[in-house]
Design a protein with these regions (language model features):
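NAD(P)-dependent Rossmann-like dehydrogenase/reductase catalytic/cofactor-binding core
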Residues: 2-6, 216-284
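Internal alpha-helical scaffold of NAD(P)-dependent oxidoreductase catalytic cores
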Residues: 112-123, 139-178, 191-228, 273
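Small-residue helix-packing motif on alpha-helices
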Residues: 35, 62, 78, 207-215, ...
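Rossmann-like NAD(P)(H) cofactor-binding subdomain of soluble oxidoreductases
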Residues: 51, 59-142
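NAD(P)+-binding Rossmann beta1-loop-alpha1 motif at the extreme N-terminus of oxidoreductases
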Residues: 1-65, 137-138, 162, 202-204
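Short pre-catalytic strand/loop immediately N-terminal to key active-site residues, enriched for Gly-Thr
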Residues: 7, 125, 175-181, 233-238
Length: 284
């Protein structure tokens, strides 16, 4: 299996997440001419072309001879894209590795749709990235078919590592729903927290722009402390909580309003909804 620098990479879909990954790959030294992107929309295709990579409107042209194919299209068009690619790969001696970031599409469905005319199926990986990947600070969950090799897994890790600081491989596909509830939807939880912190401080008289800068940097700084410290988040919380101090007063309010249960139910709701979206019988 060639390295990420030597591999031919195809992106089917050139939206924001694909653009972020491509930018990350280029920053890691991947040759622009080794990347081809299929994108039907002129505006998106022009933005991608500005990065110096090859572009096309043909999925087969982009992915026909690629080593790694990233499917980054909307779930409702994923089946057609996969069937088109599977048909084009029938003459190939070796099939590519396929990574899907299409939400709610199961591995079994992907492998069925990607099956070639001679009944072979590409080794396939499902990935749940999150939006901080757009600034190179993503967190991704991944689940692979049992036939994936260690070299293929390393290739996927290298691709995801260009935009994700954390990539976690789960042992069961249903755990991707939990990943969705945790890190996939997670950025919105922090946005909401900062939103409400700013509103509270503004109501107490602090100018909104100052409150926004302070709250945003506090969120960023706390995250960096968790990344760089050997202490658990629980211990870090205890470290900054003096008995009967200001932080203690705030956290006591959290406890009295059952903040823990709010978080539990929120993650459970997102996880359950992710599972529903992955079940064709429950999709709206």
């Amino acid at each position: 299996m060639p390295s990420i620098q030597e591999s031919k990479l195809a992106f089917i879909g050139g939206g924001n997440m694909a653009s972020a990954i491509i930018g990350g790959l280029l920053s890691k030294g991947v040759n622009k001419q080794n990347i081809c992107v299929s994108e039907p929309w002129d505006v998106n295709r022009e933005k991608i072309a500005a990065l110096g990579v090859r572009t096309t409107t043909s999925n087969v042209e982009a992915g026909g001879d690629a080593d790694l194919v990233i499917i980054a299209v909307k779930p409702q068009v994923t089946k057609g894209v996969c069937q088109e690619l599977g048909g084009a790969w029938s003459p190939r001696a070796t099939l590519p590795v396929v990574v899907s970031i299409a939400a709610g599409i199961t591995l079994d469905s992907l492998k069925e749709w990607l099956t070639t005319s001679d009944s072979r199926t590409a080794h396939t990986v499902r990935v749940m990235p999150n939006t901080p990947a757009l600034v190179g600070e993503g967190a991704s969950g991944a689940f692979a078919s049992t036939d994936i090799t260690s070299d293929e897994k390393e290739l996927v890790n290298a691709m995801l590592g260009s935009v994700s600081k954390a990539t976690e491989w789960v042992d069961r596909e249903d755990l991707l729903d939990v990943v969705t509830g945790l890190s996939g939807s997670g950025p919105a939880y922090f946005f909401a927290m900062v939103e409400h912190l700013v509103a509270s401080a503004t109501a107490l008289g602090l100018p909104e722009d100052q409150a926004t800068r302070l709250a945003t940097q506090t969120c960023l700084g706390a995250g960096k402390m968790m990344v760089e410290s050997s202490d658990s988040p629980s211990q870090l919380r205890k470290n900054v909580t003096s008995p009967n101090g200001t932080t203690y007063a705030a956290l006591q309010t959290f406890e009295s309003l059952n903040f823990k249960e709010i978080v539990n139910k929120s993650v459970q709701a997102a996880t359950a909804r992710s599972a529903e979206l992955g079940n064709p019988s429950t999709k709206p």
